[in-house]
């Protein structure tokens, strides 16, 4: 077994142990610069996830619980999110974040909404990259916290960009089964939120619509990367977050989104 340490946005870390050298090497690459090999003494006391290669998949050990998976990278991502879920100084949103004129623009959506393709398109158009899949917010300041990971794109998303004449630098990762893209321009400092877009793909229309505060709160309830306890503190935080500029963004054309971001 080899163990690596992954540093988290709250300055703590988790340990990931595995007997699979390809898995360890892919994690070291995917979580760089926040990841490194651990010495024997360093993993002691840290939240630890063990992934033992077996029968074409992995036996996952987390505390006293064990399960089998064929998706080790999702297990690592979910483990990190669960570990951070108890940190009341952070809030995790499912979406992508980019910078424009010193402010963060957040694109929030469920999986399959095209947010990865959209984020990569905007990066190729010159907007600095902040996050994709998991956006970290500081609850006290509502600042978006940078915590770099590359973009993971499916084949179909890359095909969309190729049809638009874009050819982002990418490499196919056999273990991730994704194209890995490192955007050229990256924002590495905390930024305030300029606007949050709740995005929906459409075959026929481009529209950006205002949202009432109750509508914003309802949408934000479905936006976190993990399930949070539905208590008074959490609802009060969401009410504060809902005061930001929020729009429903229905889009067919990617350049329509670019124009919305710039105006």
Residues covered by each model-derived region:
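N-terminal "assembly arms/tails" that initiate or stabilize quaternary assembly
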Residues: 29-33
């Amino acid at each position: 077994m080899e163990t690596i340490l992954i540093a988290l946005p709250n300055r703590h870390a988790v340990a990931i142990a595995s007997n699979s050298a390809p898995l360890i090497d892919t994690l070291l690459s995917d979580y760089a610069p926040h990841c490194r090999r651990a010495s024997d003494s360093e993993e002691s006391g840290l939240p630890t996830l063990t992934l033992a290669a077996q029968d074409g998949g992995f036996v996952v050990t987390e505390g006293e619980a064990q399960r089998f998976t064929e998706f080790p990278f999702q297990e690592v991502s979910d483990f990190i999110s669960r570990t951070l879920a108890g940190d009341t100084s952070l809030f995790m949103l499912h979406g992508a974040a980019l910078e424009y004129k010193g402010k963060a623009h957040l694109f929030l959506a469920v999986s399959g909404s095209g947010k990865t393709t959209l984020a990569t398109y905007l990066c190729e158009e010159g907007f600095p990259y902040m996050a994709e899949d998991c956006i970290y917010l500081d609850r006290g300041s509502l600042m978006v916290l940078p915590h770099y990971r590359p973009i993971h794109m499916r084949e179909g998303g890359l095909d969309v960009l190729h049809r638009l004449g874009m050819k982002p630098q990418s490499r196919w990762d056999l273990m991730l089964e994704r194209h890995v893209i490192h955007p050229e321009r990256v924002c590495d400092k905390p930024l305030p939120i300029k606007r949050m877009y709740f995005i929906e793909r459409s075959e026929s229309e481009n529209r950006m619509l205002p949202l009432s505060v109750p509508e914003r709160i309802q949408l934000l309830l479905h936006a976190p990367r993990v399930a949070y306890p539905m208590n008074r503190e959490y609802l009060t935080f969401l009410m504060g977050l809902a005061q930001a500029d929020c729009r429903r963004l229905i889009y067919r054309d990617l350049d329509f989104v670019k124009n919305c971001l710039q105006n």
